[in-house]
Amino acid sequence: MSDIRFTDQHEWVRVDGDIATIGITDYAQEQLGDVVFVELPEVGKDIAAGDEAAVVESVKAASEVYSPVSGEVIDVNSDIEKTPAGVNENAMGDGWFIKLRLADPSELDKLMDEAAYSEFVESLQ
């Protein structure tokens, strides 16, 4: 069973075993508008929790995507590099950014669950 957690910077992480899939939330892609460019890290790169993991550019702004957890990049979503609009179309699914081999599962405890994140987003509106 996978478990999904959220940051206050609107990144999500879905964990399945020791693999963490990371992307941006629907709220984030709505705020960005039409995504026109995505820059992803190289496979094999070690990323610490809170470090820049990717860059996403939209018609409105460029924004860094920070990793919610630490680990080694084991896969990147080349589909969204080729077709960045995939982030807008399915941010929480096929629009994922990177997959990491999770270094420290306890980092997940610092992140919000879905209910807490929903409350957080409501507080912003």
From Swiss-Prot:
Residue numbers bearing the N6-lipoyllysine modification: 60
GO biological process terms held by the UniProt record: glycine decarboxylation via glycine cleavage system
Xref: InterPro entries: 2-oxoA_DH_lipoyl-BS (IPR003016), Biotin_lipoyl (IPR000089), GCV_H (IPR002930), GCV_H/Fam206 (IPR033753), GCV_H_sub (IPR017453), Single_hybrid_motif (IPR011053)
Cysteine-cysteine disulfides: none
Note describing how the cofactor binds: Binds 1 lipoyl cofactor covalently.
GO cellular component: cytosol; glycine cleavage complex
Cofactor(s) in the UniProt record: (R)-lipoate
UniProt cross-references to HAMAP family, sorted A to Z: GcvH
Family: Belongs to the GcvH family.
Oligomer and partners: The glycine cleavage system is composed of four proteins: P, T, L and H.
The name this protein goes by in its record: Glycine cleavage system H protein
Species the sequence originates in: Parvibaculum lavamentivorans (strain DS-1 / DSM 13023 / NCIMB 13966)
